[in-house]
Each structure stands twice: as structure tokens, then as C-alpha cells.
């Protein structure tokens, strides 16, 4: 039996958390989601990943605009944690300046998903991208228990 994929989710909007969970269900993905509502919580979790039994995610989904920081702050910390080097990191946001995107990519973001305004597009885009990233990660050794 395959173990559930683990997703590190930094998202302050509970409505978006629900939509992401629904997108994963629609893709028939069995996922364990570790949710962090602020950049500060996510940074602390990223520092702990792989240490003292703290789980290493298969994928990191990061809202860019968060209370107490942003996605780049989380990416910077994740980049310093060797256990997170091979983990795909996806920025999910409704708005991002070009220089912010460039900075996020330099810090290790794999790609950007723009949050659409309508529900069905979000379901399709987020679900498909997460499925793609998780499948790609299976072969790269990023998955760990």
C-alpha cells in the first residue's frame, strides 16, 4: 500500500485551504496536509523538517502574501535546510510583482500558480499542478517517510 503524500501548505485564507483540499480530492490524491496560517509558523516548521522526527513533505505549496512574512521568507529558510533541497516548492498566489516572482525563483520556487477568480479553474489548475509535481517528485528521491 502506498503511503499518503505529505504536503506543506502555507496559506492564511481558510477558504483557499478548503479549495486546495477539494482540488486534491478531485485528482484522487491521498495527501496528508500540514497547514500553516502565517509565514512565521511555516518558517518554524521548515526549520524543523527532517529534524527530531519532524516529517519531510513531498511538496511545498506556499501562498506568497501571508501574515508575518511572505513566501520568499519561507523559501529562504527551506533553502538552508538540506532535507528540503529536493522538495518541489510551488508559489500559489493571486498577485505577484515580476521582481517578487524572480526572487522566489532564485530562492528555489519550482513554479507559480496564479489563483484564478473562479472555483472550477482553481480546482483544475491547482489539482493538476500538484498531481504533476508529486508524480515528478516520486522519481527524484524527494519523497521520504
State where each predicted segment sits.
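Short amphipathic alpha-helix used as the core "switch/output" element in two-component signaling
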Residues: 72-85
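C-terminal output helix
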Residues: 117-127
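Active-site residues of response regulator receiver
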Residues: 62-63
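Alpha4 helix (beta4-alpha4-beta5 surface) of REC/receiver domains from two-component response regulators
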Residues: 22, 73, 96-113
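Hydrophobic/aromatic residues positioned on beta-strands within the core alpha/beta folds
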Residues: 92-93
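Acidic catalytic/metal-coordinating carboxylates
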Residues: 38, 70-73
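Acidic, metal-coordinating helix/loop segments flanking the phosphotransfer/catalytic sites
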Residues: 35-59
Amino acid at each position: 500500500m502506498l503511503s499518503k503524500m505529505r504536503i506543506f501548505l502555507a496559506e492564511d485564507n481558510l477558504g483557499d485551504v478548503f479549495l486546495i483540499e477539494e482540488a486534491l480530492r478531485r485528482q484522487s490524491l491521498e495527501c496528508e496536509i500540514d497547514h500553516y496560517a502565517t509565514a512565521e509558523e511555516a518558517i518554524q516548521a521548515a526549520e524543523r523538517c527532517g529534524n527530531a522526527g519532524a516529517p519531510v513533505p513531498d511538496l511545498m505549496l506556499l501562498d506568497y502574501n501571508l501574515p508575518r512574512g511572505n513566501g520568499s521568507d519561507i523559501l529562504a529558510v527551506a533553502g538552508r535546510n538540506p532535507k528540503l533541497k529536493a522538495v518541489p516548492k510551488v508559489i500559489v498566489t493571486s498577485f505577484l510583482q515580476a521582481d517578487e516572482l524572480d526572487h522566489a525563483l532564485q530562492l528555489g520556487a519550482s513554479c507559480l500558480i496564479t489563483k484564478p477568480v473562479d472555483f472550477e479553474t482553481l480546482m483544475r489548475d491547482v489539482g493538476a499542478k500538484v498531481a504533476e509535481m508529486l508524480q515528478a517528485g516520486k522519481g527524484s528521491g524527494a519523497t521520504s517517510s
